[in-house]
Amino acid sequence: MLEKIINRENLSFEEAYNLFKELMNESDVRIAAYLAAFQTKGYTAEEIAGLAKAMRDYAIKLELGEVADTAGTGGDGSSSINVSTASALILSAFTKVAKHGNVSITSKSGSANVLEALGLNIKIPPEKARKMIEKTNFTFIFAPMYHPALKRIMPVRRELKVKTVFNILGPLANPAEPKFQVLGVNSPDLVEKMAEALSFLGVERALVVHGMGLDEVNPRGETIVAEVNGEDIDMYTLTPEDFGVERVKVVPCNSPQESAERIKAVLRGEGKVEDRNFILINASAALYASKVAEDFREGVELVKGILGEPMSKKLEEIICTSRS
């Protein structure tokens, strides 16, 4: 199949699925060649879905019922705080969340990095994950623990130090198979493709977002959105005004520790207005995608109502349960 990809021929869903199986047994050189060739060719929605389905099927099984997830492809170069992780924590005050993530590959702080900086034990095995989500509505699925099939591929990906198809696949490969999802992408070209891939994978409702260079809902301007409802996909744009929130700039973040402190400040009902508004609109999008909120303005009001003591206690409960 390598020659086919080099010749810029697209793969079917089944071919992409089988390609993942092949990669598990290939040499480092051929894995690197596949990743580079795929990156040069670009990917179709069908290819993305086929690879993601294979990743899910070869992952350690995790049956948690209907859950939500918030994730981004990363690689947008913004060095922003971990907004999708903050949104997942807030969302868990309303519904079950299985946050799938990893340490940083292309940014300063991945979801695993910031959760560890917050004090969580990120290495949660399946049985504990089930108990944790029952008790707290939240669990973290640390990708390296749940995707043993990637052991051959990940060292090559790290050595390449460039974006690959696995930046895109990570947010789709949650072994808990979330029914509800917000998925941020680092390129406008990926919005519709990823929405189609999520539809292929059977999501109930999802929002795929790109905010003028950000793989988040943009607090300073427009965000392109693909809303997935089963097989239906609607494209539209959002601005902070649609949330009833004032526009703010994105303040860069230098480390997981800084991101954790700034997130904690917002959860306490404090923090900079830039961080607060950024988290408000993204958490609202997560509430809407999960069918908790009827619209984005209601989502913001629900989030505002939980910030402060309720979210501080919620975070402490999640941390303590992860470590017990």
UniProtKB/Swiss-Prot annotation:
Q: Which positions does UniProt annotate for anthranilate 1 binding?
A: G72, N102
Gene3D superfamilies tied to this protein: Nucleoside phosphorylase/phosphoribosyltransferase catalytic domain (3.40.1030.10), Transferase, Pyrimidine Nucleoside Phosphorylase, Chain C (1.20.970.10)
Q: Which domain of life is it from?
A: Archaea
The reaction(s) catalysed by this protein are: N-(5-phospho-beta-D-ribosyl)anthranilate + diphosphate = 5-phospho-alpha-D-ribose 1-diphosphate + anthranilate
Q: List the disulfide bonds.
A: none
Positions with a binding annotation for Mg(2+) 2: D215, E216
Q: Name the enzyme group at the top EC level.
A: transferase
Known pathway: Amino-acid biosynthesis; L-tryptophan biosynthesis; L-tryptophan from chorismate: step 2/5
The entry's keywords: Amino-acid biosynthesis, Aromatic amino acid biosynthesis, Glycosyltransferase, Magnesium, Metal-binding, Transferase, Tryptophan biosynthesis
Q: Which cofactor does it need?
A: Mg(2+)
One Pfam family matching this protein: Glycos_trans_3N
Cofactor binding, per record? Binds 2 magnesium ions per monomer.
Enzyme Commission no: 2.4.2.18
Q: Where does 5-phospho-alpha-D-ribose 1-diphosphate bind?
A: 72, 75-76, 80, 82-85, 99-107, 111
Q: Which residues bind Mg(2+) 1?
A: S84, E216
> Which positions in this protein are listed as binding anthranilate 2?
R157
Subunit text: Homodimer.
Similarity remark: Belongs to the anthranilate phosphoribosyltransferase family.
Please give the name of this protein.
Anthranilate phosphoribosyltransferase
Report the source organism: Pyrococcus abyssi (strain GE5 / Orsay)
Question: What lineage, starting at the top, does this entry show?
Answer: Archaea, Methanobacteriati, Methanobacteriota, Thermococci, Thermococcales
